[in-house]
């Protein structure tokens, strides 16, 4: 994946940004939906499933080096977050 900034991601999915403005220039080099695959410079997409809500893993992805999370509801964590109505639709828009 070509590196893109959080700002570019934000613009492509029309989300609301939660975080320090200087984080908008951070580079994202991978996008993951499995929290175990989060690594430095990745963006975690939190997906609500029937049994598991990916939002509960957002803090863990931050500790693994993720620079941003795409969420449907703000999570109590220091990671910069892009809040959207549907993370699935936003992921499609970003692609």
Question: Model-flagged regions — what are they?
Answer:
Residues 1-95:
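Short, basic phosphate-binding NTP loop
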């Amino acid at each position: 994946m070509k590196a893109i900034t959080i700002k570019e991601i934000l613009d492509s999915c029309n989300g609301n940004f939660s975080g320090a403005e200087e984080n908008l220039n951070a580079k994202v080099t991978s996008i993951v939906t499995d929290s175990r695959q989060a690594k430095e410079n990745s963006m975690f997409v939190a997906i609500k499933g029937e049994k598991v809500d990916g939002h509960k893993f957002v803090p863990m992805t931050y500790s693994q080096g993720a620079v941003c999370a795409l969420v449907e509801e703000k999570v109590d964590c220091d990671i910069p977050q892009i809040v959207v109505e549907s993370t699935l639709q936003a992921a499609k828009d970003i692609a």
